[in-house]
UniProtKB/Swiss-Prot annotation:
GO terms for biological process: translation. Belongs to the bacterial ribosomal protein bL32 family. It comes from the Bacteria. GO terms for molecular function: structural constituent of ribosome. GO terms for cellular component: large ribosomal subunit. HAMAP family: Ribosomal_bL32 (MF_00340). The gene is rpmF. InterPro entries: Ribosomal_bL32 (IPR002677), Ribosomal_bL32_bact (IPR044957), Ribosomal_zn-bd (IPR011332). This is Large ribosomal subunit protein bL32. Keywords: Ribonucleoprotein, Ribosomal protein.
Length: 59
């Protein structure tokens, strides 16, 4: 097994883990329909920034 040469202090351990957290995805709300979608992506019904950009199956 590997053995550490020097013990890492709690402060250094915390600084090492500072970037290990998860971030929630940034959601945007479509102005025309009120649906939530990922930013810079179209909504499930084909709208992007208030305009219909993709035809859906129901149309």
């Amino acid at each position: 097994m590997a053995v550490q040469q020097n013990k890492k202090s709690p402060s250094k351990r915390g600084m090492h883990r500072a970037h290990d957290f998860l971030t929630a995805p940034a959601l945007a709300v479509e102005a025309s329909t009120g649906e939530a979608h990922l930013r810079h992506h179209i909504s499930p019904n084909g709208f992007y920034r208030g305009r219909k950009v993709v035809k859906t199956k129901g149309e």
